[in-house]
């Protein structure tokens, strides 16, 4: 007996147990509603998706070609449409995740309006967006199953046993739109207790994976901006522990923690690390400080000094009371950060880089893997990179190293459209196309994400529509550029009433009121023009 039929049988038994007062209840309708609402709580989702992510991590360890991917989504509808599209084109959601970007929460979801990525937005906007994303994905499940149920009723009415069997199999083997989410908690929005409290909210909303960074919470900057300030390892590890305790308290034992290091581009620290003996973690952190050796007689009022190897060292302190690291130490600090995080509870790493360069990432990962052989990265394929210019310059430099003639190119102007059809541009585009595959094969990247692609796609599509609609094209701009494309490409949203749940509501009306139901999907519904 199929899972669907088992649900019907279970509800039928309940109906019989409750006698005549349940005479209006149709067991098959109730079974359908149960199947459409597979995940009852966010914790159900977090546990289910954590198991998926752990399985994917193990599969990547065995075969680096099976990496995972995601796109950042700033609204539940965007996440829903992404997963509907993935199922339509690729037939499965396997290895495809959601990403929640703190940058987009700040820019698009705050009651204060657009904000920079500096943790100034309401922290509950983060957990709120996670809940919203999964609400929309659960609705996508309900909608797709509703279409299957409607088809099943039609097959039965037509006496088509083969079609009925086919649809029953599709119902039993239905793949949910619910997938893992990697959710950005920034630097934790405060101390370790604040981190724990927000992590709980995020997990309760459905997050199986939380990404946390080693910046100072109240000095936090976007990873691609200047002025980043890191914290000593002991402070960061306390927040990793806080997230782990939140997972364990809520029973999400497989919860995943991504430890992000911003040290490559961070030249400052807010404080000198506590150290108890030479070579301990605090001492290693302090060893990267930009210091000058002084004598006791040179000590000034309020000076901060450290003693290393019998020498008095005065760290360079800025007017902001921040301390400066030595230039050129970023990669060494990143490697230390990553090894330390993995040895103290993190599952995955995130190294924020200033450019997309497989060789640069690989060099750091190779050093990390000397200590932790299965170290894996989540990597930000960031829109903050000029991908075209970066890769054209990489190819230009490779051509020079190979002794090729590059006299036809100006390295500083390679973004120009005049180079689009050149050999250099074609080689660069191919390297962009294979960047994720190459990064996973050679640089330990388990998960590739784009942080804020849907921010840019929303702006681009709106610009294209406005450009024509408010000018000479008028309504043709919408019809030609949007609706006609939706119809021809099979975009489900062209039937927007159905996408918003109108047909589900109509079926519920029939469940609840029988033949007396007043439905919205009759012959006068304009959505019938799109069949």
From Swiss-Prot:
Under which name does UniProt file this protein?
A: Isocitrate lyase
The organism's lineage is:
Bacteria, Pseudomonadati, Pseudomonadota, Gammaproteobacteria, Pseudomonadales
Query: What keywords sit in the KW lines?
Result: Glyoxylate bypass, Lyase, Magnesium, Metal-binding, Tricarboxylic acid cycle
Task: Note the subunit structure.
Answer: Homotetramer.
Q: Which residues form the active site?
A: 222
Kindly list the cysteine pairs connected by disulfide bridges. Answer: none
Q: In which pathway does it act?
A: Carbohydrate metabolism; glyoxylate cycle; (S)-malate from isocitrate: step 1/2
Q: Where does Mg(2+) bind?
A: 184
- EC number per UniProt: 4.1.3.1
